[in-house]
Amino acid sequence: MATRSPGVVISDDEPGYDLDLFCIPNHYAEDLERVFIPHGLIMDRTERLARDVMKEMGGHHIVALCVLKGGYKFFADLLDYIKALNRNSDRSIPMTVDFIRLKSYCNDQSTGDIKVIGGDDLSTLTGKNVLIVEDIIDTGKTMQTLLSLVRQYNPKMVKVASLLVKRTPRSVGYKPDFVGFEIPDKFVVGYALDYNEYFRDLNHVCVISETGKAKYKA
C-alpha cells in the first residue's frame, strides 16, 4: 500500500517565475514580485492529496470543514478530486461539508489573537472523521486553537490538510497531516489567499511586492 506523499518542499532560494509568463490581471501588475506556484502545479498536487485523504480517512463518514475565507479554493478543488475518487471506486463513503471562519491576520502579520467569527453548529462533528481544510499554516497557533475547539465535540478522527506550510522562526512546531507545499517565509497571495481581502482572484500563488503591500495596507 502506498504511503502518504510528503509535501513539495520549495527551497529558500527558489526564484519563482516571471509574471510575463502567465496570465495576471492587469490591476495587479505592479503589486506582485513573481509567480511562486503556478495554478497547474497546485491542481496536480491537490489531486494527489485527495488520494492520500481517501486512503487514510475513507473508511467512515467524512465531514470536510473549510476554514474561510482563504481555504475556499483549495477546499473546492480538493473536494472535487475526492468526489471523483468516490464515484469511480468500488467503495464509496458519505461526505458532508461544513464551514468555519477565523481571523488572525492584520496586513502581513499573524496577530496571534484568534477570533472565531463565523461557523455552523459544530456538534455535527461528533463521531465523524473530520478533515479540516486550510489555505496556509504560518505560526500554527490558529490551527492549534481550532483543533482544540473541534476536539470538544468528540469526533472519531481529526486530520488537517493545508495547501501551504510556511517555514518560519515564529512557528510553534505544528505540522498538518496533509501538506501541499512547504514554502519559505514569504508573504504569498492568490488562489484565494489574500492581503487585506485583495488578491483572492488570482489563479496562481504569487509573492506580493512592497508596492502591493503599501497600496492595500489596512
Curated annotation (Swiss-Prot):
Cofactors (names): Mg(2+)
Cofactor binding note of this UniProt entry: Binds 2 magnesium ions per subunit. The magnesium ions are essentially bound to the substrate and have few direct interactions with the protein.
Reaction(s) catalysed by this chain's protein: IMP + diphosphate = hypoxanthine + 5-phospho-alpha-D-ribose 1-diphosphate; GMP + diphosphate = guanine + 5-phospho-alpha-D-ribose 1-diphosphate
Residues annotated as binding Mg(2+): 194
Modified residue annotations for N6-acetyllysine: 103
Cross-link position per record: Glycyl lysine isopeptide (Lys-Gly) (interchain with G-Cter in SUMO1): 115
Effect of residue 104 to R: In HRH; Munich
Pathway entry: Purine metabolism; IMP biosynthesis via salvage pathway; IMP from hypoxanthine: step 1/1
List of catalytic residues: 138 (proton acceptor)
GO biological process, one term: positive regulation of dopamine metabolic process
Consequence when changing residue 195 to C: In HRH; Dirranbandi, Asia
Consequence of substituting residue 51 to P: In LNS; Banbury
Variant or mutagenesis effect after changing residue 54 to L: In LNS; Japan-1
InterPro entries (UniProt xref): HGPRT, Hxn_phspho_trans, PRibTrfase_dom, PRTase-like
The protein's role, per its UniProt record: Converts guanine to guanosine monophosphate, and hypoxanthine to inosine monophosphate. Transfers the 5-phosphoribosyl group from 5-phosphoribosylpyrophosphate onto the purine. Plays a central role in the generation of purine nucleotides through the purine salvage pathway.
Subunit structure as annotated in this protein's UniProt entry: Homotetramer.
Protein name: Hypoxanthine-guanine phosphoribosyltransferase
Native source organism of the sequence: Homo sapiens
